[in-house]
Amino acid sequence: MFTGDGFWHNGVVSYIGMVIILLQTPIFFNQQYPSLVDIAQRWQLVWDKDAAFELRFDQNCLSLHKRDEPKLDGISVDFVSGAVAHRRKFGGGRGQSIAKAVGLKQGVTPTVVDGTAGLGRDAFVLASLGCKVIMVERHPVVAALLEDGLRRAYEDAEIGEWMRDLMSLFHGSSISALADAAQSSGTEIDVVYLDPMYPHREKSALVKKEMRVFQTLVGADLDADGLLAPAMALATKRVVVKRPDYAEDLDGVKPSMVIATKKNRFDVYVKSAMK
């Protein structure tokens, strides 16, 4: 069982866990704003006047901006309003493909580790359907955005109570976190969900904006194939891998079943029945 800096406590997550990443990340921000200074210190971010990215804190929201593309809107994590809130209310509930992939059904609501959290959208969908979700994110800037999104969601009158119960964040290497958790006798995780970054062919404005920003910020997930083995060791029921429809199988391993959508697919690696 993980305690302290780990993300396990009695088999579930009850707080935001964080480990210190020794490699400091350069970022630009207004040093006159104490809130930004505090965020930088917490996430081991180093002020750099020549950094490619800027963090801003406006209207109680942390956002990331690509400095050489000032016309791009900032990227932030918002679980309270916008597209994710609309999907929570009108997205199809447990009939959604992602819900089927993780094994959600009547009487079964799995505990899920999202090993590649990103902006937390898929994790939020699962949490809104009742799953307890632990998000793992290794990049400190992305983790800072996630933490800020969680903070605002926890404070929200409509969703705050269940968000505090069901969604939490762990900052660290996904491969190491999954491998370490798999060796813990107190760990009980039904499903590990993975969505490694993969080059997109779509040309929509949203994809272009986010992929341009994220690929510049974090780079490609060159070690993505290394996620499958520790994920399989940790999950008691199944591992779900979200892939573009044209992508090869993760680590070259054929899934037990595939749930296809219009643009993506969910490769499901079954270990035991959901019950």
UniProtKB/Swiss-Prot annotation:
It is found in: Cytoplasm. It comes from the Bacteria. S-adenosyl-L-methionine binds at residues 121-122, 137-138, 173-174, 195. It catalyses: guanosine(1516) in 16S rRNA + S-adenosyl-L-methionine = N(2)-methylguanosine(1516) in 16S rRNA + S-adenosyl-L-homocysteine + H(+). Keywords: Cytoplasm, Methyltransferase, rRNA processing, S-adenosyl-L-methionine, Transferase. The keyword S-adenosyl-L-methionine applies. GO terms for cellular component: cytoplasm. This is Ribosomal RNA small subunit methyltransferase J. It comes from Shewanella frigidimarina (strain NCIMB 400). The lineage of its organism: Bacteria, Pseudomonadati, Pseudomonadota, Gammaproteobacteria, Alteromonadales.
